[in-house]
């Protein structure tokens, strides 16, 4: 008698998902692992993150799905804001709490000395990338050299620190710390900054907490945890995504009529009479189907604006 086989449950097919998940990444997760988990929960065909956030760090990790991936580079280039806790008096091999202790020094720091040290790092500064970073040297991430006990030459990189605000201090305790908010350009290493501030104070330091609170114009307001995404009903998870144009809110908005929309979607340049002073790029909205019952304006893409001419750059197909 043939053995009865129970059919395996069918997995839902991958589907077109378009939008941005403002993920509040938990500690201990790599950015790629968080992306893979979210992609699986949404059954999305296409996804990408907008720059790595260390496993040690928590906070805002925008994940782009579908057509939103066309604009992920804009967030890679965007300014960032972090909140971090620096433990003074101890220097480690990784500039964070996961490394080996390299040195311990007494801490004798006044609030005035702290402010003076911090002020030295506001503005354009040169940073040497840490060995424990994902930056590549000869095609290999620096952290792989570090794990093998090797140190390689790294060129200093110019970054901009827009502001450093002191949120809290605990300078007199047995484990002195300072909590900072840092607004900075892309490519800034907060671990290196914390270590350098410690050296400027004469006692050394390392990060014990790091949280990203802003990327470009995106903040933690409305951010979603992996737990919340997992707990949501499968057919309700898509509603947790922000629309594609959440990535484009800093660009001026241009609306086209049905004929202009059709030409734009065919990649044609459009001479227009528009008052757009100081704008060189715009987000474009228009009608995709003029004969549809609901012919409302939707995002068509991003265009260059120069000399009164709209030139399509990145088209969106929703």
From Swiss-Prot:
Family matches, as Gene3D superfamilies: Pseudouridine synthase
GO biological process: mRNA pseudouridine synthesis; tRNA pseudouridine synthesis
Record's keyword terms, sorted: Isomerase, tRNA processing
Top EC class of this enzyme: isomerase
InterPro entries, alphabetized: PsdUridine_synth_cat_dom_sf, PsdUridine_synth_N, PUA-like_sf, tRNA_psdUridine_synth_TruB, tRNA_sdUridine_synth_fam1_C, TruB_C
Catalytic residues, chain numbering: 54
Enzyme Commission number(s) from the entry: 5.4.99.25
SUPFAM superfamilies: Pseudouridine synthase (SSF55120), PUA domain-like (SSF88697)
Catalytic activity: uridine(55) in tRNA = pseudouridine(55) in tRNA
GO molecular function, one term: tRNA pseudouridine(55) synthase activity
Family designation: Belongs to the pseudouridine synthase TruB family. Type 1 subfamily.
PANTHER family listed in its UniProt record: PSEUDOURIDYLATE SYNTHASE TRUB1, TRNA-PSEUDOURIDINE SYNTHASE
Function, as annotated: Responsible for synthesis of pseudouridine from uracil-55 in the psi GC loop of transfer RNAs.
Protein name: tRNA pseudouridine synthase B
Phylogenetic classification of the source organism: Bacteria, Pseudomonadati, Pseudomonadota, Betaproteobacteria, Burkholderiales
